[in-house]
Each structure stands twice: as structure tokens, then as C-alpha cells.
């Protein structure tokens, strides 16, 4: 439940998702997701995470999203999706080795990869954030002056909280 996962959860709730489930290896990030209302339920991102997600969602998520970019996170998203479900991979990096027949083909899973959106989509999102009264700045857990950028990067690299922001005086 890093910044992207928190944002995905908040947007899913705004779009009417009846249940959002977060998975992370860091408990404090799951706590933050609960406090912000981004997730309704949390599972530890371990070897049993996909099974736990399927148990909470009556067989799997209609839509699962991996924002981590980690191999383990991607597998949880793929295996936590229901038959005929959709899985969106957002996080950058790493490789993915998956049993294509078992995980994708036999379950009729649709997998989407996405990166950066277009300007008009971003404008649409900003308008909707205002209409839905969503405030993504709530995902910011640490703020640093530009002069403290090295410390900000250290905190972000620890991966224990939400978004880390560099701010200016003006």
C-alpha cells in the first residue's frame, strides 16, 4: 500500500467498488490504507496472500491491481483475480514468470499493463477528484523542504509510509 496502491484503493472506492483488499509486506502501510479508507480488508503479502484474497472475495476479485512492480505482488494480483476477472499491472520493474495456462488461459483472465496516462485523462481525473471530494494529498505521510531532499529520498526508499513530498516555501 504505497502511494500508488493507496490512490488506486481510494479511486476504486469512489468508483463504487463494494470491497477493496490491500496486500503489503509492511503492516504500517496496511494500517494507513485502512485509516484513509482506501481498503476495507488487508492481507499480509506472503505465500498465502492470493488464497486469502480469494477467501475474502468469494473466489477472487473482479478487478485486481498491482502497483508494487514486485514479482510477488504481481502474482498475488493475478492469482487473486476471479475467473473471467481483470488484472491491471501498474508497477514498474522486475520480471514475471507465471504458469500461463493455469493462471491466465484456463481462468480466462484479462491482463492490462498501464503506465502514464494522457493529458486529457489527467484533466478528467482532476475534475472527478474535485467532484468526488477526494484529496490525494491525504496519502502524503512525510513532507521535506527541498534542502532536505536526501533525507526525503532515504525515507521514501524505506517504504514504510505513504507518499513522500518535497515542498517549497512558495
Regions found by a protein language model. Give the residues of each.
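Residues in the short beta-alpha loop(s) of Rossmann-like NAD(P)-binding domains
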Residues: 25-26, 93, 117
